[in-house]
Amino acid sequence: MTSLGTPIQGVTLYSFTRAFHARQYDLDGLIRKVAAEGFGPGLELIGFSSLRGFPDGIDDAFVGQFRDLVAEVDLIPTSLAVNVDTGIRRDRLMNHDELVEYMSKQIEVAARLGFPIARVQISLTPDAMESLLPVAEKYGVTLALEVHADQHGAHERVLALRDRYEKLDSPLLGFTADWGATVTGFAPSLLEAYRRRGAAEDLLRQVVELWNGFYAEGPPNTQKVHGERFGAFIGLAARSGRPDLGIDFAINGTGLFGPAPLDTWLEIMPWVRHVHGKFFGIDENGEEPSVPVRDLVRQLVENGYSGAISSEYEGWHWNNWQDPFDIIRGEQAVQRSAAANAGSAMITDASEARRILNSHLAQPVRG
């Protein structure tokens, strides 16, 4: 019988992008704010958006300052999100060797800063992940590929990666499970944002009905199906006289609100090394109305997951009328309540979290 998991509470600074971009906080100040609010102990950053000069410009002086800061405020680096920018060149896509070199620099910085995990992205193929395994071994960093809508745990691309992981049998290869893949409704806060942009109620009703229909059909298991759904949102906006909203509907309706059922995570659960607690808002009842946070936490606990959950508030893209710190506070309260209801607890003590995270990442995949 699997022992109950004890997930580690944490947050990604991505949740506070609006405040960071508005220069309300610099990196030092935002990390201190996170610690003071009790949003840790887990701390996740995105390399290119949080760290000036990433990756080549990260010198030893900055590394020392960063490590000293997180030690001072008693936070634990959990995951550094790194990018797979295969299309960064104007003339062609990166070739295999260029991609490995590009990723290697970022993985090295993750290790220097003290992050045990580098979140990588779905555009990495099984062959690329296999080529990066020696890099992961060199630096002692787990590569956790993010499973993000429109993909999900049972998507063909994800299963191909899982099968390669099983063949390679290394604890340094795994997944970051992003809860946006398993959403149960169109976010009310986004509908409100569309209202504020002048969208008619009838159009919003049709958007919700279209998404609900895709939810009933089940998740897209191929890129072809995803493309058809993407186009359906664009067509709806055009027919309704709001073509300016078409791409917005499509990106959010397919790329943020994934309609996969929760049990699709079971296809890859043994390889889940990190979790993005993706959510979009907290309602007047103190709950997330479109992401089944309680069920997701229970699933992790019951399957023995003891890694970090980085609360990832994505509603900042459109919600400029609510405080993201209040919203994170509310969502983490839901996580703690859900873990308790499942017979366990979220880990909020830094010393205990360090021990548990080290053990979680050291375990064989099927240990």
Curated annotation (Swiss-Prot):
Gene3D superfamilies: Divalent-metal-dependent TIM barrel enzymes. Its cofactor is Mg(2+). It catalyses: 3''-dehydroisovitexin = 1,5-anhydro-D-erythro-hex-1-en-3-ulose + apigenin. Mg(2+) binds at E146, D178, H276, E312. GO terms for molecular function: lyase activity; metal ion binding. The keyword Transmembrane does not apply. The active site is at H148. Keywords: Carbohydrate metabolism, Lyase, Magnesium, Metal-binding. InterPro entries: Xyl_isomerase-like_sf. It comes from the Bacteria. Optimum pH is 7.5. Its EC number is 4.1.99.-. It is an enzyme of class 4 (lyase). SUPFAM superfamilies: Xylose isomerase-like. Activity is strongly reduced in the presence of chelating agents. The keyword Magnesium applies. Optimum temperature is around 40 degrees Celsius. Heterodimer composed of an alpha subunit (CarB1) and a beta subunit (CarC1). Belongs to the C-glycoside deglycosidase alpha subunit family. Carbon-carbon bond-cleaving enzyme which participates in the metabolism of C-glycosides. Acts on the C6-glycosylated compound 3''-dehydroisovitexin (3''-oxo-isovitexin). Shows weak activity with 3''-dehydroisoorientin (3''-oxo-homoorientin) and 3'-dehydromangiferin (3'-oxo-mangiferin). This is C-glycoside deglycosidase alpha subunit. It comes from Arthrobacter globiformis (strain ATCC 8010 / DSM 20124 / JCM 1332 / NBRC 12137 / NCIMB 8907 / NRRL B-2979 / 168).
